[in-house]
């Protein structure tokens, strides 16, 4: 989210690269711009302005392209990370009541700024995800629910994505340098994927899908999703790891491999593909 403030020109270029690649919709860079994500950087009082300006960056990229491209507003249950760690900073984890208030604030701003869809990204639990989903649905906009999953190394079941459970390590790090294990959420629960789907779909959502998950996990997750959801499906897989020794991403599939593997997952129910 800080790139929107300190490097807006780069955000625009990233949007333009997606447009030039042929996408029909771009997503605002608001994955991590809820108030509780900005407060650790002393930007909490600029939350509304940052979200407004971030939508404007997406709109500028569309204008620059001269094409008719839709804009989706991104929201997530992402929490601010502890310094030099890959886990939420407990000093800035909001109460559920504050979390709900912050999501409603962000969703309202995104709607007022004209996004056509809200995409909820990387949902991997129930407690935080249902708060976000309810806040998004309150806007009346179409809501696309993006779930993340993995095949548990403990029992081979599909679960909400969890660093402890995933077979393929996403972050390459020295445990002596990073003594605390990576966590997506402070509770670090390993939750059955079907349970997550059914808990959330009982609340609502127009599209469900799998994102930020390895191809092998996405394939198995799709089977679970299709067994529990009859509506349209989206997906965009994870294709990079993060190496802390170089602070760079390691790409796991080239363009041809990505296309081939995505093609294997397309059917009449899968309507949306992202990258």
Q: Where do the model's predicted regions map?
A:
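Domain-level signal for soluble alpha/beta catalytic cores
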Residues: 1-275
């Amino acid at each position: 989210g800080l790139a929107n403030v300190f490097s807006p020109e780069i955000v625009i270029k990233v949007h333009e690269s997606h447009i030039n690649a042929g996408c029909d919709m771009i997503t605002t860079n608001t994955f991590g711009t809820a108030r509780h994500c900005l407060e650790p950087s002393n930007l909490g009082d600029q939350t509304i302005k940052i979200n407004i300006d971030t939508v404007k960056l997406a709109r500028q990229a569309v204008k620059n392209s001269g094409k008719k491209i839709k804009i989706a507003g991104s929201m997530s249950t992402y929490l601010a990370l502890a310094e030099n760690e890959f886990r939420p900073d407990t000093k800035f984890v909001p109460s559920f009541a504050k979390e709900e208030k912050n999501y409603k604030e962000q969703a309202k701003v995104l709607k007022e700024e004209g996004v056509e869809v809200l995409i909820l990204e990387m949902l991997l639990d129930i407690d935080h995800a249902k708060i976000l989903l309810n806040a998004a649905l309150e806007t009346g906009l179409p809501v696309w629910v993006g779930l993340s999953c993995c095949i548990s190394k403990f029992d081979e079941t599909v679960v909400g994505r969890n660093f402890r459970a995933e077979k393929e390590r996403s972050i390459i790090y020295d445990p002596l340098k990073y003594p605390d294990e990576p966590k997506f959420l402070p509770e670090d629960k390993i939750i059955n994927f079907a349970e997550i789907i059914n808990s959330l779909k009982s609340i609502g959502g127009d599209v469900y899908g799998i994102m930020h998950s390895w191809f092998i996990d996405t394939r198995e997750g799709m089977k679970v999703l299709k067994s529990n959801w009859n509506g349209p499906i989206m997906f965009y897989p994870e294709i990079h790891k993060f190496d802390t020794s170089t602070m760079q991403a390691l790409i796991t599939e080239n363009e041809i491999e990505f296309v081939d593997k995505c093609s294997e997952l397309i059917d009449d129910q899968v309507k949306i593909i992202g990258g």
